[in-house]
Regions:
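Acidic/His- and Gly-rich active-site-bordering loop/insert found
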Residues: 1-119, 138-145
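Acidic/histidine-rich catalytic neighborhood of metal-dependent amide-processing enzymes
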Residues: 120-187
Length: 187
């Protein structure tokens, strides 16, 4: 088993499975999202996972502007030239359990090798895990990497209507990227 598979099995899979169990409907589909606390719970779960990754030069902060859905900014200082922004989201669309195949449920992580089934695992819960693990593996290999900033929102499935005020408010923190990578498979 290579190192990325080890991290997937021992670290990402358990956390991503917990993420699947959080309904976390996007604000358009759950008007009481703030009271429900599920969007915040997805960010908190991901931050707990980040804490255990041993990534050098990493910091993160959850942001909340007024009544807007929360945004997480993760910054990993570069050891080489360049700046990259990685975009991802943690909110989900409503699901209809009756439309799922036998033995599957949107809020229950099911592993059928090599696939993991559950709402939000592909669109788009994996994004932050992928980015952070990629940088972790580069660091473990002693390879230089650019400054990496992740912006992870919780309103994408509603059309990202909460994102523009954050982009404006966090403009300095987001830096001057050479590249923007959108980690959204649209699954």
């Amino acid at each position: 088993m290579d190192r990325s598979e080890e991290i997937w099995e021992s670290s990402i899979l358990p956390s991503l499975s917990d993420f699947i169990g959080i309904k976390a409907l996007s604000p358009l589909f759950e008007p009481n999202w703030a009271e429900m606390g599920e969007l915040d719970a997805t960010i908190d779960l991901f931050c707990e996972w980040l804490e255990d990754q041993g990534i050098a030069g990493m910091s993160y902060e959850k942001h909340r502007i007024g009544e807007l859905s929360p945004v997480l900014i993760v910054t990993i200082e570069g050891t080489g030239p360049g700046e990259v922004i990685f975009y991802s989201h943690l909110d989900k669309q409503p699901s209809k359990p009756e439309l799922w195949s036998e033995g599957l449920h949107p809020l229950k992580a099911v592993r059928r090798d090599p696939w993991l089934y559950g709402r939000g695992s592909v669109d788009d819960g994996y994004g932050g895990y992928l980015c952070a693990t990629s940088v972790r593996l580069l660091q473990e290999a002693g390879a230089p990497h650019p400054r990496c900033t992740m912006i992870i929102e919780t309103c994408e499935e509603s059309g990202s209507f909460d994102l523009p005020p954050y982009l404006e408010a966090l403009n300095e923190q987001l830096g001057n990227p050479d590249m923007v990578v959108v980690l959204d498979s649209g699954g």
